[in-house]
Amino acid sequence: MLARRIIAALDIKDGRVVKGIKFKNIRDAGDPIELAKRYESEGIDEIVFLDITASYEKRKILLDLVERVAEEIYVPFTVGGGIRTVEEAREIIRRGADKIFINTAAVENPSLIKEIADLIGSANLVVAIDAKWNGKFWEVYTHGGRKPRGMDAVEWAKRVEELGAGEILLTSMDTDGTKQGFDIPLTKAVVDAVNIPVIASGGAGKPEHFLEVFRIGSDAALAASIFHYGEYTVRELKMFLAKNGIPVRLD
């Protein structure tokens, strides 16, 4: 059984981390490099940077940041937010990111998935899916969770795999930010429907939540606030998982 991955998420705006971060002994909680190094030293497996500025003029700030991160940290990192073209994807990889993710652009132009996968390789392409239960099915949302699309998230996940995505980053809008646990029914439905790795996201509040989501077959789990606020360190979380029989990297 492959080691399960713990992934930290950082929201970036104008090259700075946003969302409250209360780490002790960090001089500048807004500096992505400093936070990334902190996570790396704690044993994080991967880091995801979501660029929420994502306006065209600001893209250079993001590209410069990608270069700096690549120089300073060794754990794999993924970059996304506003990527709409094959060229943008290639440039981010060229600057040193290990993977990129797309979301809205994939829904609006599904052939982009295949084009990017053909160019940079499926292993380097993650498709992010934001979903919310609408009473009948889990509906796909785009534009940062603002726009419902009328599409079934489980069916979309299958299509994304067929088109060449190497991984799915699945966020439940119902549990996101609640700290009450991951959305187990949604995550299980997607995990059971596809053969590519699924990263569960939205709702992590304590180590038991990670255990739950790994037990239903998630390959990785992503969290932000649980780590940002220093409630649990990555190492504490991994020790807990290892004790409970989940394979994790502990070096």
From Swiss-Prot:
Pathway: Amino-acid biosynthesis; L-histidine biosynthesis; L-histidine from 5-phospho-alpha-D-ribose 1-diphosphate: step 5/9. The keyword Transferase does not apply. One of its GO terms (cellular component) is cytoplasm. CDD domains: HisF (cd04731). The keyword Isomerase does not apply. It catalyses: 5-[(5-phospho-1-deoxy-D-ribulos-1-ylimino)methylamino]-1-(5-phospho-beta-D-ribosyl)imidazole-4-carboxamide + L-glutamine = D-erythro-1-(imidazol-4-yl)glycerol 3-phosphate + 5-amino-1-(5-phospho-beta-D-ribosyl)imidazole-4-carboxamide + L-glutamate + H(+). Belongs to the HisA/HisF family. GO terms for biological process: L-histidine biosynthetic process. It comes from the Archaea. The active site is at 11, 130. Pfam families: His_biosynth. IGPS catalyzes the conversion of PRFAR and glutamine to IGP, AICAR and glutamate. The HisF subunit catalyzes the cyclization activity that produces IGP and AICAR from PRFAR using the ammonia provided by the HisH subunit. InterPro entries: Aldolase_TIM, His_biosynth, HisF, IGPS_HisA/HisF, RibuloseP-bd_barrel. GO terms for molecular function: imidazoleglycerol-phosphate synthase activity; lyase activity. Its EC number is 4.3.2.10. This is Imidazole glycerol phosphate synthase subunit HisF. Keywords: Amino-acid biosynthesis, Cytoplasm, Histidine biosynthesis, Lyase. It comes from Pyrococcus furiosus (strain ATCC 43587 / DSM 3638 / JCM 8422 / Vc1).
